[in-house]
């Protein structure tokens, strides 16, 4: 039998079982857990290679073959694991994960390739599910380009543009605004969903927003997040199967964190920026991560804790929440939210799986294009400061930690907001929202972004060059971002909206997909991130303990995935 060295094999077909890779310039190491290929029967496209007529390409009709095959890709996914496989796409969905080729002459083929199949070379590349950012202020549409080019393919949030209310809160208030935003969503290669304003003491104003098309309701302290508003909002959400997101009462005007937790009455809720710098009961909203019904997320400015984190937050907060630096009370409000002790604890609670999700808080104390980067910078910092997780101990890799962190911006926000039946992981039947990365650029600069099976964006060279690669190489929209191909993206709505004639009358062009199962989600359902430690915060020193253990870590003075990759 012919043999080949591991190095030569990896250079030709990508890494295989037992091979290890470094993610970008971090200290995170992945190891391939499984390879679906049959050695000697790999498929690869190119001159003199396998995918040619009568060889790796068979004679089947379109109904029997993949529309697209991504060959020899290394999947990194919270659900699928860290596995090497061919991935077949069909009708905009992930059709099969397995072994591609020509079943007429090759053994073990699960993804037939034919004349109707396009090929994307995944050799030496990492394939992830498109990211999900569940904390979007819809301040400007240009955010969508930034998010897409960073590897995010689903954006959930609220707002109407650069209105003062949207600068501060993720709410698209009332049926008129909701319908206009649903119409605007048709123009973008992005899955989108909208939150209505959840601050009301009677159910009527909330129900009409859900019927108009929002996928959830947002309670925000700037609109008055009182116990009565919380209770009313959750009651409507339970009735109509939508999620509730909350930014709690920083000033503790209508109660303390215990008051808010009591108002939940054990019902499911997504707590935004649960550390508190982004807003919430000062100084101890972080206690919420210990509740079985609370699904906690972070926003990315505090991720990870660095020597610059505290300094940048004060001015950011003053602008975003319409505060006046000349008013002492406004300054005191801002300063109460920025605490180095709880930000440091947030790092550790992410690493232990107590914080379940990562998000941006786009243009409103968060950077929309940095959800992915900040997630992996946090993972790197924790690897350096805390060493291997118990689940990875002695294995020589960081596979479990990597699955834990990628879940924070893929499957967990999908589960939380009732869209995991469509997006959030690399599983057969889900929308083919996929991102290809060179390992050296993982988490920083993707190579290709697919939406619904079609390339929507890519790092592309000079369009007038004789080949695709000459400088300037920068991110450009591809054909999936134009015309009726925008139907490769979806707009998420409530179940009530699908039955609403007023929504049908909008004649929206992108497919509408209803959220489902939002009210039965528990912290235990958060993949690799379901820990519920008992949290204590000292009201004087802000020191945080989890199950009695002191949570302390130093700020980072240097990070990977930073200036090495960006000139400007």
UniProtKB/Swiss-Prot annotation:
Primary location: cytoplasm
InterPro entries: Amidohydro-rel, Metal-dep_hydrolase_composite, Metal_Hydrolase, Urease_alpha_N_dom, Urease_alpha_subunit, Urease_AS, Urease_asu, Urease_asu_c
Annotated ranges, domain Urease: 130-568
Gene3D superfamilies: Metal-dependent hydrolases, Urease, subunit C, domain 1
Pfam families reported for this sequence: Amidohydro_1, Urease_alpha
Residues binding Ni(2+) 1: 135, 137, 218, 361
Post-translational modifications: Carboxylation allows a single lysine to coordinate two nickel ions.
The keyword Cell cycle is annotated on this UniProt entry: no
One GO CC annotation: cytoplasm
Binding-site list for Ni(2+) 2: 218, 247, 273
Modified residues (N6-carboxylysine): 218
CC cofactor: Ni cation
Active site residues per record: 321 (proton donor)
Record-level Gene Ontology MF annotations: nickel cation binding; urease activity
Reactions the enzyme catalyzes: urea + 2 H2O + H(+) = hydrogencarbonate + 2 NH4(+)
Domain of life according to the entry: Bacteria
Keywords: Cytoplasm, Hydrolase, Metal-binding, Nickel
Residues the record lists as binding substrate: 220
GO biological process, one term: urea catabolic process
Subunit field text: Heterotrimer of UreA (gamma), UreB (beta) and UreC (alpha) subunits. Three heterotrimers associate to form the active enzyme.
Record-stated family: Belongs to the metallo-dependent hydrolases superfamily. Urease alpha subunit family.
HAMAP family to which the protein is assigned, alphabetical: Urease_alpha
Listed name of the protein: Urease subunit alpha
Lineage of the organism: Bacteria, Pseudomonadati, Pseudomonadota, Betaproteobacteria, Rhodocyclales
């Amino acid at each position: 039998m012919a043999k080949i060295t591991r190095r030569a094999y990896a250079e030709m077909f990508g890494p295989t079982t037992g091979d290890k890779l470094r993610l970008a310039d971090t200290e995170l190491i992945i190891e391939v857990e499984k390879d679906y290929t049959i050695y000697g029967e790999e498929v690869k496209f190119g001159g003199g290679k396998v995918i040619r007529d009568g060889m790796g390409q068979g004679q089947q009709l379109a109904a029997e073959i993949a529309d697209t095959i991504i060959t020899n890709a290394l999947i990194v996914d919270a659900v699928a694991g860290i596995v090497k496989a061919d991935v077949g796409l069909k009708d905009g969905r992930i059709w099969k994960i397995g072994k591609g080729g020509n079943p007429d002459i090759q053994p073990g083929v699960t993804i037939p390739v034919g004349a109707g199949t396009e090929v994307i070379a995944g050799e030496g590349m990492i394939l992830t599910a498109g990211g999900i950012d569940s904390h979007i202020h819809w301040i400007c549409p240009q955010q969508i380009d930034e998010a897409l080019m960073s590897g995010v393919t689903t954006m959930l949030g609220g707002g109407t543009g650069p209105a003062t209310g949207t600068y501060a809160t993720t709410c698209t208030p009332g049926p008129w605004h909701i319908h206009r935003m649903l119409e605007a969503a048709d123009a973008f290669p992005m899955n989108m969903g909208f939150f209505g304003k959840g601050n009301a003491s009677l159910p009527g104003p909330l129900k009409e927003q859900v019927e108009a098309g929002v996928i959830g309701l947002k309670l925000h302290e700037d609109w008055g997040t009182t116990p009565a508003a919380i209770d009313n909002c959750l009651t409507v959400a339970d009735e109509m199967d939508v999620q509730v997101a909350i930014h709690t009462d920083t000033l503790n005007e209508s109660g303390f964190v215990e008051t808010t937790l009591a108002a939940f009455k054990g019902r499911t809720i997504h707590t935004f920026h649960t550390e508190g710098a982004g807003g919430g009961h000062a100084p101890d909203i972080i206690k919420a991560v210990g509740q079985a019904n609370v699904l906690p997320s972070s926003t990315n400015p505090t991720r990870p804790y660095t020597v610059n984190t505290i300094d940048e937050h004060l001015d950011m907060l003053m602008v975003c929440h319409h505060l006046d630096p000349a008013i002492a009370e406004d300054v005191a409000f801002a300063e109460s939210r920025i605490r180095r002790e709880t930000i440091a604890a947030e790092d550790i609670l992410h690493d232990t799986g107590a914080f379940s999700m990562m998000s941006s808080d786009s243009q409103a104390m968060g950077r929309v294009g940095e959800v992915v980067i900040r997630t992996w910078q946090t993972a790197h910092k924790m690897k350096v400061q805390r060493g291997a997780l118990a689940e990875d101990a002695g294995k020589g890799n960081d596979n479990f930690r990597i699955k834990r962190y990628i879940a924070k911006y893929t499957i967990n926000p999908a589960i939380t907001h009732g869209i995991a039946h469509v997006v959030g992981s690399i599983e057969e039947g889900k929308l083919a929202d996929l991102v290809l990365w060179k390992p050296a650029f993982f988490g920083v600069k993707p190579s290709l972004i697919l939406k619904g099976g079609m390339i929507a964006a890519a790092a592309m060279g000079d369009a007038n060059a004789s080949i695709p690669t000459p400088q300037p190489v920068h991110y450009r929209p591809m054909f999936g971002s134009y015309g009726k191909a925008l139907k490769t993206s979806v707009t998420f709505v409530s179940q009530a909206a699908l039955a609403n004639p007023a929504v049908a009358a909008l004649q929206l062009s992108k497919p509408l997909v209803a959220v489902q199962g939002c009210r039965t989600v528990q912290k235990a359902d958060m993949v690799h991130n379901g820990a519920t430690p008992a949290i204590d915060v000292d009201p004087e020193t802000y020191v945080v303990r989890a199950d009695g253990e002191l949570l302390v870590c130093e700020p980072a003075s240097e990070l990977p995935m930073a200036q090495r990759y960006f000139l400007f």
